[in-house]
Design a protein with these regions (language model features):
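Nucleotide/phosphate-binding catalytic cleft detector across ATP-hydrolyzing
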Residues: 1-88, 105-106, 116, 129-176, ...
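A short acidic Gly-Thr/Ser loop motif
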Residues: 88-95, 101-104, 113-117, 210-213
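Feature representing long, continuous alpha-helical segments
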Residues: 121, 175, 179-186, 190, ...
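Conserved phosphate-binding/catalytic loops in two-lobed NTP-binding clefts
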Residues: 225-255
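Phosphate/pyrophosphate-binding loops at sites that engage ATP/ADP/AMP, CoA/4′-phosphopantetheine
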Residues: 185, 189-205
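Residue-level signature of catalytic and energy-coupling elements of molecular machines
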Residues: 55, 90, 123, 188, ...
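Residue-level detector of high-confidence beta-strand sites
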Residues: 109-111
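Glycine-rich phosphate-binding loops at beta-strand->alpha-helix junctions
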Residues: 43, 143-145, 200-225
Length: 273
């Protein structure tokens, strides 16, 4: 474990019982020697302490911690995805989180240190606008593929304190967004190659979720960079009828996943009595 980190979760991947290998669940087997491979998730002690302190200040108590892409995966994945093998790519504000499932087992997790906030800052510095303007342009006019942006379309940005208005090319905006999103997807490809899983192994492809996944043409860029099928993951797999439509947006995947985690833990505890 890295210095300054602590274990958040220990997830079993597979078991061995004597000469029997790759056993997902050892219950029912008999033998002399039992072994296992585990996926250990760690986190920075200071960050964990700050999270606990923030929760306690709100009058609540932290029961458990869960890695963001695992929470999102719980909200957007179904049993078929788990069986087929998928990569969950959760594009948040500060980071992009990756969780890879193969043969029903969590095989890999990673945190890529770039997210939607980096794109906003790139637009701010590249086009010389305010951060609020950069965020608004990204949401309203942004595209992850510059080839899909209209060459002769411009956005008018009001001038500051009497200065003349500024004309921003939609094409230039898309070029900036594509550069950063391509970098993020290159990291995703790198991690998948490192663990030996690609489009031939992950038949379910890539599931994009999180607030950053709402960028136009992101699916096409992801498929181009990674060579894998991609789709947007909506957190509606486990929502009951009559739910608020707002909750089905990808930006709420982590929140829905955490609620599911809490509910499932309560149900297990309740049924044990």
């Amino acid at each position: 474990i890295p210095a300054g980190d602590q274990i958040i979760d220990v997830i079993p991947q597979e078991f061995t019982v004597d000469n029997f290998q790759n056993i997902p669940n050892p219950i029912g087997y008999s033998g002399v020697k039992v072994g296992a491979n585990f996926h250990i998730i760690t986190g920075d002690k200071t960050a964990i302490r700050n999270i606990n302190r923030a929760v306690e200040k709100s009058g609540l108590k932290t029961k458990d911690l869960m890695l963001q892409p695992l929470a999102s995966a719980a909200a957007v994945m179904c049993d078929q995805d788990l069986e087929a093998g998928v990569a969950i790519v959760d594009i948040g504000g500060g980071t992009t989180d990756l969780a890879v499932f193969y043969e029903g087992i969590l095989k890999h997790t990673a945190v890529i240190p770039f997210g939607g906030e980096n794109i906003t800052n790139d637009i701010k510095s590249g086009l010389g606008v305010l951060k609020t303007q950069a965020e608004q342009m990204k949401i309203q006019f942004g595209s992850a593929l510059s080839d899909e942006a209209r060459t002769n379309t411009f956005i008018t940005i009001p001038g500051l304190r009497g200065m003349a208005a500024k004309e921003i090319s939609v094409k230039n905006l898309a070029n900036i967004i594509q550069a950063r999103m391509s970098e993020i997807m290159d990291f995703v490809s790198y991690h998948l190659k490192q663990i030996g899983l690609d489009n031939r192994m992950l038949n379910g492809g890539i599931i994009l979720t999180g607030g950053g996944s709402q960028l136009k043409h992101l699916i096409q860029l992801t498929e181009y960079v990674t060579g894998m099928n991609a789709r947007i993951g909506f957190p509606n797999e486990h929502l009951c009828g009559g739910h608020t439509e707002e909750l089905t947006k990808p930006m709420y995947s982590t929140c829905i996943g955490l609620i599911l985690k809490g509910y499932n833990d309560f149900e297990i505890k309740f049924n044990s009595f």
